[in-house]
Amino acid sequence: MVHLTPEEKTVVSALWGKVNVDAVGGEALGRLLVVYPWTQRFFESFGDLSSPAAVMGNPKVKAHGKKVLGAFSDGLAHLDSLKGTFSQLSELHCDKLHVDPENFRLLGNVLVCVLAHNFGKEFTPQVQAAYQKVVAGVANALAHKYH
């Protein structure tokens, strides 16, 4: 559960309505893989991840980034029940994929950077504060099934 004020909910929804999920998802996941290269071990089947240019241009990275942000969009529609919304994804990432839950926090912070880059002055400190709450809540929900 994420505790947002009505004003925070408004700014999150307003900005998210302008987000190009395809582009932002690919950029966020790509940046995660470049900035934190140890996360690439979960994506070995994606092919060439040998350089920043290869990662950022990789169609599988872009496609998976779109998928990740699609799930994030679902979470935005269910801010009061994030653990339930992400229960199956948490179980998958914990039990089958064995993803370090810290990676969820890293990806959330990268997403905030990408949003700031894409929206410039529109991404005010108020908007950032609201999004930091959201990505922290999503990361916590995704880590919920970990023992």
Curated annotation (Swiss-Prot):
PTM annotation (Phosphoserine): residues: S51
InterPro entries, per the entry: Globin, Globin-like_sf, Globin/Proto, Hemoglobin_b, Hemoglobin_oxygen_transport
Molecular-function annotations in GO: haptoglobin binding; heme binding; hemoglobin alpha binding; metal ion binding; organic acid binding; oxygen binding; oxygen carrier activity; peroxidase activity
PROSITE patterns: GLOBIN (PS01033)
TM annotation in the entry: none
Binding site for heme b: H64, H93
Domain Globin: 3-147
Tissue expression pattern: Red blood cells.
Family per similarity comment: Belongs to the globin family.
Assembly, per entry: Heterotetramer of two delta chains and two alpha chains.
Protein name per Swiss-Prot or TrEMBL: Hemoglobin subunit delta
